[in-house]
Swiss-Prot record:
This is GTPase Obg. Gene3D superfamilies: GTP-binding protein OBG, C-terminal domain, GTP1/OBG domain, P-loop containing nucleotide triphosphate hydrolases. Residues 1-158 form the Obg domain. GTP binds at residues 165-172, 190-194, 212-215, 282-285, 311-313. The gene is obg. Belongs to the TRAFAC class OBG-HflX-like GTPase superfamily. OBG GTPase family. Its main location: cytoplasm. Its EC number is 3.6.5.-. PROSITE patterns: G_OBG, GTP1_OBG, OBG, OCT. Mg(2+) binds at residues 172, 192.
Amino acid sequence: MFVDEVEIKVKGGQGGNGVVSFRREKFEPMGGPDGGDGGDGGNVILRVDEGLNTLADFRYQRHYEAERGYHGSGKNKHGRSGEDLVLKVPPGTVVYDADTDELLADLTEDGEEYIVAHGGKGGRGNARFKKSTRKAPRFAEKGEPGEERSIRLELKLVADVGLIGFPNVGKSTLISVVSEARPKIANYHFTTLKPNLGVVALSEYKSFVMADIPGLIEGAHQGVGLGDEFLRHIERTRLLIHIIDISGIEGRDPLEDFKTINRELEKFNEKLSSRPQIVALNKIDLPGARENVERVQPVLEEKGYKVFPISAATKEGVKELIYYTGDLLKELPVERKIAKEDRIVIKPDFADEEENIVVEKKNGIYEVSGRLVEKYVIKTDFNNDAAVKRLLRVLQHHDLNELLRDKGVKNGDTVKIGPMEFEYME
């Protein structure tokens, strides 16, 4: 089954917990802290596999989570990091944040990877907290949760040439005679229900990729017919071959067909209307077709189009069309990627972050937000008194009590920091 758009949820692995441990040596029952760190959680990674051509593998499973990191142990043994979860996608997969619609990645090359959800960092063991004024720390950190997000995957096929035109004009027949592609071919509309890719070999060392785009009709940009489901696959092509049924057997005017398809391209994406086009007047083997060629070809050539009368069924004129296409492609730039703004993302070190704490009262609850204090809360083991005391010292260091009092907090009020709720007490 061909699937070219899907939404999934991904989550990086939870970081492993650090451990509280002390050396047990002969004559030194409390020989100092030796608790190891927890391992980092695994990442969720998208990797391009050129053997795939659909997103169908994501149709029935929509939630993916990488392996969590392992906990630390005594003797300064750090936990193993969780295994990355690699999800294979076809070339041409575009990744969007499903909530913000932000373009995250455009994956086109075989083996190309993108980390779509980072694993959580492992918690530090108590050996990390030893210092001159704290020789026997009895607390460690819990691991951080992995990054979690919803993403939308869209497949935009990677092809040099796109075949466009009304249904039943001969696109599938053409790609079948010039490549090894074997699309379903029949004499009725919308026979082609998915794009077909074929490699056109001009010589042993020269070839290009052609995509047979399912038939477009008026209103395609709004989803009429097979519509915008397949228009996106034209976006990556460098060149379009516009196939027209010159026989008139369908009862339509060839010139009106040409205008209609180009209007749909422009309405869907203005850049498509300026994409170079070669016109193939197909089915010249049928009665009356050559007379129509004499009428239509001069009109299109006057507009600046290169026109080839062909018969995909008998292969007449096909060789000339394909070799001209190959020559023209040599002159056109290769632009595979969908443009996005360059962004430099700097993740500050946990210990060096400057905190900006905000306190807001919502529905009677005082909600505290701040990257650092929220992270400390997440990493605190509330079953460990020493860890809780350390958290209170951190919050006091950041003047949280003063900020809460400024907002009018009273004893017994609920204070929420990250996922945790506390009862305020002076």
